[in-house]
Amino acid sequence: MRYVEGSVTTGPKRISKIGLGTWQFGSREWGYGSGYAATDAADIVRRALELGITLFDTAEVYGTGRSERILGAALANDPDAPRRAYLATKIMPVVPVAPVVEQRAVASAARLGTRHLDLYQVHQPNPLIRDRWTMPGMSALRAVGLVGDVGVSNYSLDRWREADAALGAPVLSNQVQYSLARPRHGAALVDFAAAESRIVIAYSPLAQGLLSGRYDASNRPAGRVRSVNSLFLPENLDRAAPLLDTLREVARAHDATPSQIALAWAIHHPQVVAIPGASSVSQLESNAAAADLYLADDEYDALTAASDRFTPTTGTANLAALARSALRR
């Protein structure tokens, strides 16, 4: 496992380049079945720690708190987890004023069974309540030791800078959708992270499985989450074919899978980490192995060029297409 070097994190823990996203813990929409939360999730967390994964990401809205509870219970099985696990969760900023921020952090910590949140993130920008009303709550949480680092999620670069100013200290991270399917989404953020020793946390780094190479227009994925993702419309799967071909070509050169190469691309930049989910221990192991893959410059450039040529259809026109697709299933 590789770890981030030279970031402005306030604590002693290392942040792994490949982490574990736990949206699927306790969330029925992924279709993993009732036994997943009871047994598989704990096995996945245990194996993640064994493999050197330290970054575990969750949120209060994942399964309406169940993800935090499941993750906390799984980490409690390892007496060394408090020393090694870098625990990150998020507040959904419905009314993100300081007293609410403080209350929600206490509730998240209780569900996670911890007295310290290594990273507490604002899940998305509130368009009406600016960060100057939110960040005093974060400062108070840091002052009492409940929170170590402060992060944001789905923030533009300008809004990230605004959060910095409101906190009066570096906001360590910005968690955004960043992958070969959506590289333009985070390019400016990555440049900022490099200049300021921050971190970009890439969620959905495999584009919900698109970059695994398992799917095409004749073999589309099931499940409610992917059924509303326009990337899986037949026309977009056709458009993704050249990108997937390039992924497979690079994967063959490394005796790796397309998913592993997609993750290696995402974490190629020193200040980017990725938090793929895992439906099984074997998938987790495959994801973790991507941290040890190093892409040559020409491979990285070829993947980036193929990604730039991938232009999925987007916008309101997709709503009708998604509705038609759902009716055909």
Model-derived features: where do they sit?
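Acidic (Asp/Glu)-rich catalytic clusters
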Residues: 12-14, 72-83, 106-114, 142, ...
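Alpha-helix N-cap and loop-to-helix initiation/capping positions
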Residues: 32-40, 66, 70, 96-104, ...
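A short, structured active-site edge motif that brings together acidic residues
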Residues: 82-95, 119-123, 177-178
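A structural motif
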Residues: 53, 114-117, 147, 271
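Short, acidic/polar
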Residues: 34-48, 97-112, 156-161
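N-terminal binding-site loop/beta-alpha segment at the start of enzyme catalytic domains
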Residues: 1-85
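Active-site groove signature of glycoside hydrolases
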Residues: 112-128
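Beta/alpha (TIM)-barrel catalytic core signal, keyed to glycine-rich beta->alpha loops juxtaposed to Asp/Glu
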Residues: 2, 125-329
